Amino acid sequence: MPATPPNRLGLTASGLLALCRAGFEKEVAAELDDFAAGIGLTGFVRTRPGSAFVTFETHEPVAFADLAERCDWRTLIFARQLLPWFARVDDLPERDRATPIATATRNAGQRFAQLMLETPDTDEAKQQSGFCRRFTVPLQHELERIGAFREGAKGLPELHILFPDTSTAWLCAALPGQAALWPMGIPRLRMLREAASRSTLKLAEAIFTLLSETERNASLRAGLRAVDLGAAPGGWTWQLAHRGLRVTAVDNGPMAPSVMATEMVEHVRADGFTWRPQRPVEWMVCDMVEQPTRIAALVADWIATGRCRRTIFNLKLPMKKRLEAVEQCRALITKRLAQAGPFELRFKHLYHDREEITGYLALRAAAV
């Protein structure tokens, strides 16, 4: 029997695996290829349209310790999860999946401290979610029995296992804090009735995804002021007011009574593209349906002129040229802020986004 895996990072990775929304595999494949090249990896991308995941296979094995710290799930815009993978187990027997998975884990020569079973976000794969819940405890016990798992041990990586179908398992690893906050990169957020619209969940996800804890604590506190452009019926406005900010909601349309009942909101009937505040505010948020370059120009102008310290905004993307549209907006913002100083610009295709991405922009001095 092979020796018990050690309490160190002795794992060797075979490539990278990214989860995404079905239909966005092409964008993730392009991003993953560029990312791999940027960190010195050579290999090739594999994907299948509609599969909701993409893999990169390296020509040569890579030390996990060298790769793991670079694999922050926020790095790729269109990926919900980004993980180094070290083994693929095929032809899993229906009556005993634990043994071959545990054997492959032990053979990798690494002990793990946390276990997470995931599936791609497709109708076919999600049928296995019940199996994953039932299988987690028995698999963990088997891993513990062979010495490949020590729950909660400090300094050890997490073990993520992806089941794209009933007979295949991709074995992946992540350092604590490097993988997505939620299994499959899908947040479990509760929709409150008074929030006016489900769009409030998009802003809630953006706040947790695009901002650090330090940034959240500094910028989302009672007494600060925010502006919501194109606010009606008030999903984003409610999210800010619920956190204690006083919000100016700019929209010619009506606001939901539940939002106005917070007594934290002033409704201004005006055009979101032309209205400007009399004094600078902490936040401007914008979820208007408009050409992405027009939104990018708007948010860049608010930051460049000091009307707000930071902004979260949504860019509606064309279906056939998503990456090109993102880079066009990035270039536009960069040019507008050339004289304003260093800035933070982050994009992410959130779970609550569809044909769109959400961005965060702030001058570097305001980023913390």
UniProtKB/Swiss-Prot annotation:
| Catalytic function, reaction form | cytidine(2498) in 23S rRNA + S-adenosyl-L-methionine = 2'-O-methylcytidine(2498) in 23S rRNA + S-adenosyl-L-homocysteine + H(+)
Please state the Enzyme Commission number of this protein: 2.1.1.186
Q: Which GO terms describe its molecular function?
A: S-adenosylmethionine-dependent methyltransferase activity
**Where, per UniProt, does this protein localize?**
Cytoplasm
Q: What is its main location?
A: cytoplasm
Q: Catalytic site residues?
A: 316 (proton acceptor)
* Chain positions recorded as S-adenosyl-L-methionine binding sites: 199, 232-235, 251, 271, 287
Q: What is the protein name stated in its UniProt record? A: Ribosomal RNA large subunit methyltransferase M
Q: Which organism is it from?
A: Aromatoleum aromaticum (strain DSM 19018 / LMG 30748 / EbN1) (Azoarcus sp. (strain EbN1))
